[in-house]
Amino acid sequence: MGTRYFLVGFLILLVLGFEAQGAHVPQQDEASSPALLTKMQKSLLGYWDTAKAAAHKLYKKTYLPTVDEKIRDIYSKSTAAVTTYAGIITDQVFSILSGED
């Protein structure tokens, strides 16, 4: 019983600590923030487009149907496994937090 309350209390204090740290951030100038954000967004989108185009070219150059089929099979199996284990972990966390024995 004590460890459950300790875990819940620890998580609450952790969240409150992060909220308190975020509260002391000084306010930025409203006029300069959107321009900087826009520049960063355009730059990141440019990098993303370049990387996506390079990956697409590499994929087209090295495309093999058997490898593609194996990759799709591995992807479907791994996502099924991750979904299963995520469900198990979610159930365990819910069980710990709700206090069911």
UniProtKB/Swiss-Prot annotation:
It holds the Pfam family Apo-CII. Component of chylomicrons, very low-density lipoproteins (VLDL), low-density lipoproteins (LDL), and high-density lipoproteins (HDL) in plasma. Plays an important role in lipoprotein metabolism as an activator of lipoprotein lipase. Both proapolipoprotein C-II and apolipoprotein C-II can activate lipoprotein lipase. InterPro entries: Apo-CII (IPR008019), ApoC-II_dom_sf (IPR023121). Residues 66-74 are annotated as: Lipid binding. Belongs to the apolipoprotein C2 family. It comes from Capra hircus aegagrus. Keywords: Chylomicron, Glycoprotein, HDL, LDL, Lipid degradation, Lipid metabolism, Lipid transport, Secreted, Sialic acid, Signal, Transport, VLDL. GO terms for biological process: lipid catabolic process; lipid transport; positive regulation of phospholipid catabolic process. The keyword Protease does not apply. Proapolipoprotein C-II is synthesized as a sialic acid containing glycoprotein which is subsequently desialylated prior to its proteolytic processing. Proapolipoprotein C-II, the major form found in plasma undergoes proteolytic cleavage of its N-terminal hexapeptide to generate apolipoprotein C-II, which occurs as the minor form in plasma. Residues 1-22 form the signal peptide. Its main location: secreted. One of its GO terms (molecular function) is phospholipase activator activity. The gene is APOC2. It is found in: Secreted. GO terms for cellular component: chylomicron; high-density lipoprotein particle; low-density lipoprotein particle; very-low-density lipoprotein particle. Residues 78-101 are annotated as: Lipoprotein lipase cofactor. This is Apolipoprotein C-II.
